[in-house]
């Protein structure tokens, strides 16, 4: 039976001093419904309901504190925040447990010890073990939960473990987000127990590493998980918290298409003007996931969580592999800072997403994107979806049948071979571009082909987000994929050559092995499978780069790009190969003159890039030149396109001077 609204104060008072079992006798036998009624209760009355004299003294002390408006001195409440006596009493819903609507910082729910039954062991941590459990609500309804119990030794819980456990409770009880694991309540028994939402499908890491015959996760679903994770981490940041342990092992699958951030044992509040948390002493931390400043100084911030987000992205697309496997923890910092090494691009990861990961791994925290920006950047890097239009049975090609959904990982209009995943078989491989057509798959959120592969197109992940673009679907994409013009790989070689010749820069140190150096602009190896992202109206397309060897490409940082569907060129829906987009007759001498003028004005660009730049600007030579210079500077730096444009304007559009300015500050 649930308490009446008028007597909630009594239940709170009794629970505060661990006398909740006397709630019904005091209410029904002694008819106490208001605090002043205790003035007429004698000690023998309390004796008659079984309350001993020590308990009576505790009750009297609690009554004094309640009447004086002083909060309870119970140790749990002192740490977690107690029930405010002046709080307005609100009766619980008939289908809810004995929960009270608490002020911010108050307990969500105190659960009777007998209401929770523990089952099989799900896992264990530094200071607790997690069991599957069953929570019986006062209404009689039972719901499956996860129960985390404080690990107790022969002499009781250690002070550090108890503090960490209660700190985790205090964090979780303030959080409410669809992609953050929810705390239902706390059991004040022996041992202390947290009753949490159950994620029945286990951790994402366990799912990624599940052996056959468990099928792999679709790469499009991994992209969805990344967006959910970015939203949850943006929420934690808005709460002034740093997670410090972001990894696939701490992402739980609440359903086949939903993850939730869990394990808040290392979460700490961000403080000070610099908005960071600095460890006070040696404590265990996940070295392979940590940012350099965390390993060097013990400093954690939202920017260090962004670094961990990049490592988590790498985990997802590498099948749950351990980052920096085989590298001793004490050498990881040296690899990151001295060698400037970064984790290599996983085979299933598009260049756009890897470029985004590299941006998350910027050496300086201020250069990393925020989680709120990452949500938009991921939208820009979204993988395109298509459908098979003819059977593919060629040796070595990805097998597909008409109607199969195909997620395009890499591909561009100037190549006849693309890379993707068959949504029916979940196999990944190369296939003829003519076998797939981009088509609206019924409103799925496949707005921008995330495989805007070339580092260039990973760069679509830079800058702010545009609401209209985020809502775009495949209907916004040109049917013939002709929005992306031919972009030969020679273009990236041109960019590298341009920067070297103009700036006289020597080769930068490599990361060694297969790890790409941070922030190095790509000297691309020959690639076979460029990508096909839509191009913004004011920006020339970037060169596709695909790494077909163990040496990872070193893509540019990802940046979001703004574009609208009316700027896309049109073509036949079933077009299999890219054609030169319309926009000016290539045989027109005036048009040829403009192309040559643009090519001579921007060192390192290709003839095809100049054509695209002119078409996107309606033949305006000056605008085309400026857009190409912005594009060049964009790939050299970790700045947004808007910043690059401002820097170029400050240097009177002198690309050489602007490049030196940026490199001096990188």
UniProtKB/Swiss-Prot annotation:
<dbReference type="GO" id="GO:0046580">
    <property type="term" value="P:negative regulation of Ras protein signal transduction"/>
</dbReference>
<feature type="binding site">
    <location>
        <position position="148"/>
    </location>
    <ligand>
        <name>ATP</name>
    </ligand>
</feature>
<keyword id="KW-0808">Transferase</keyword>
<dbReference type="InterPro" id="IPR020635">
    <property type="entry name" value="Tyr_kinase_cat_dom"/>
</dbReference>
<feature type="compositionally biased region" description="Pro residues">
    <location>
        <begin position="531"/>
        <end position="544"/>
    </location>
</feature>
<comment type="subunit">
    <text>Interacts with the SH3 domain of PLCG1 via its Pro-rich domain.</text>
</comment>
<dbReference type="InterPro" id="IPR049587">
    <property type="entry name" value="TNK-like_SAM"/>
</dbReference>
<feature type="modified residue" description="Phosphothreonine">
    <location>
        <position position="510"/>
    </location>
</feature>
<comment type="similarity">
    <text>Belongs to the protein kinase superfamily. Tyr protein kinase family.</text>
</comment>
<dbReference type="InterPro" id="IPR017441">
    <property type="entry name" value="Protein_kinase_ATP_BS"/>
</dbReference>
<dbReference type="GO" id="GO:0030308">
    <property type="term" value="P:negative regulation of cell growth"/>
</dbReference>
<feature type="modified residue" description="Phosphoserine">
    <location>
        <position position="96"/>
    </location>
</feature>
<dbReference type="InterPro" id="IPR001452">
    <property type="entry name" value="SH3_domain"/>
</dbReference>
<dbReference type="InterPro" id="IPR001245">
    <property type="entry name" value="Ser-Thr/Tyr_kinase_cat_dom"/>
</dbReference>
<keyword id="KW-0472">Membrane</keyword>
<dbReference type="Pfam" id="PF07714">
    <property type="entry name" value="PK_Tyr_Ser-Thr"/>
</dbReference>
<keyword id="KW-0728">SH3 domain</keyword>
<dbReference type="GO" id="GO:0005524">
    <property type="term" value="F:ATP binding"/>
</dbReference>
<dbReference type="InterPro" id="IPR036028">
    <property type="entry name" value="SH3-like_dom_sf"/>
</dbReference>
<feature type="modified residue" description="Phosphoserine">
    <location>
        <position position="255"/>
    </location>
</feature>
<feature type="modified residue" description="Phosphoserine">
    <location>
        <position position="515"/>
    </location>
</feature>
<keyword id="KW-0418">Kinase</keyword>
<keyword id="KW-0829">Tyrosine-protein kinase</keyword>
<dbReference type="InterPro" id="IPR055175">
    <property type="entry name" value="ACK/TNK-like_SAM"/>
</dbReference>
<feature type="active site" description="Proton acceptor">
    <location>
        <position position="245"/>
    </location>
</feature>
<dbReference type="Pfam" id="PF22931">
    <property type="entry name" value="SAM_TNK"/>
</dbReference>
<feature type="domain" description="Protein kinase">
    <location>
        <begin position="116"/>
        <end position="383"/>
    </location>
</feature>
<keyword id="KW-0067">ATP-binding</keyword>
<feature type="domain" description="SH3">
    <location>
        <begin position="381"/>
        <end position="441"/>
    </location>
</feature>
<dbReference type="InterPro" id="IPR011009">
    <property type="entry name" value="Kinase-like_dom_sf"/>
</dbReference>
<dbReference type="GO" id="GO:0046777">
    <property type="term" value="P:protein autophosphorylation"/>
</dbReference>
<keyword id="KW-0547">Nucleotide-binding</keyword>
<comment type="function">
    <text>May function in signaling pathways utilized broadly during fetal development and more selectively in adult tissues and in cells of the lymphohematopoietic system. Could specifically be involved in phospholipid signal transduction. Involved in negative regulation of cell growth. Has tumor suppressor properties. Plays a negative regulatory role in the Ras-MAPK pathway.</text>
</comment>
<dbReference type="GO" id="GO:0016020">
    <property type="term" value="C:membrane"/>
</dbReference>
<keyword id="KW-0963">Cytoplasm</keyword>
<dbReference type="InterPro" id="IPR050198">
    <property type="entry name" value="Non-receptor_tyrosine_kinases"/>
</dbReference>
<protein>
    <recommendedName>
        <fullName>Non-receptor tyrosine-protein kinase TNK1</fullName>
        <ecNumber>2.7.10.2</ecNumber>
    </recommendedName>
</protein>
<feature type="region of interest" description="Disordered">
    <location>
        <begin position="442"/>
        <end position="589"/>
    </location>
</feature>
<dbReference type="InterPro" id="IPR000719">
    <property type="entry name" value="Prot_kinase_dom"/>
</dbReference>
<dbReference type="GO" id="GO:0004715">
    <property type="term" value="F:non-membrane spanning protein tyrosine kinase activity"/>
</dbReference>
<feature type="modified residue" description="Phosphoserine">
    <location>
        <position position="498"/>
    </location>
</feature>
<keyword id="KW-0597">Phosphoprotein</keyword>
